[in-house]
Amino acid sequence: MSDPTNPLVEEATKRSGLIWLALPDLPQPRAAWHLWHDGAAYVVTGGIEQPLPGLPEAERVTVTVRSKDKGGRLVSWVAAVSEVESGSEEWEAVVPLLAKERLNAPDGETQTERWAHEAFVMRLTPTGEVTESPGEMPAGYAAVRPVPSPATSVGKPPFMVGGRRRRPDR
């Protein structure tokens, strides 16, 4: 079987620390940290991990990758979604690598056991279908707006040292 992975898809996804997933029944894509390993992107969802509703049940999703240099959308590709079963050979190979990539884990050493019981490790395998790439972007406006969150702050900016003018000395 030939490898359907486009070199641009692999290189862009490997370099990017964040991908955007167009999940079923959601109005806009969700950001997700990931790991690229052996021709596929791996993400962890469920429990206290990143919320990606509908991903474990999905068969295919569209993945959008941004440019590491400019931050703009670089390539979008379609992925076949499959769950990595706990205890499988693939689990044993991928989960330690994912654990190293996971920042600020609340349980550190025991996170892999927690993932086995309450989270899903999902494999996103490129199908070979590239929906957007440089020179083939849609003409319409397609910027992703941030997901509403109670963690935003609105108010006056904090006091800045040296920000007020002083009276001249006499």
Locations of the language-model features?
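A generic local structural motif
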Residues: 5-8, 28-30, 48-50, 108-110
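Short secondary-structure boundary/capping segments
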Residues: 10, 33, 112-114
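General structural signal for secondary-structure boundaries
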Residues: 1-8, 31, 85-87, 100-104
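Short beta-alpha junction loops
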Residues: 67-69
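Short amphipathic alpha-helical surface micro-motifs
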Residues: 1-4, 44-46, 56-65, 101-107, ...
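Short beta-strand segments
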Residues: 15-48, 53-55, 61-65, 74-77
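Charged, gly/pro-rich active-site loop segments
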Residues: 72-170
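Short, conserved active-site entrance elements at the starts or edges of catalytic domains
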Residues: 1-28, 151, 160, 168-170
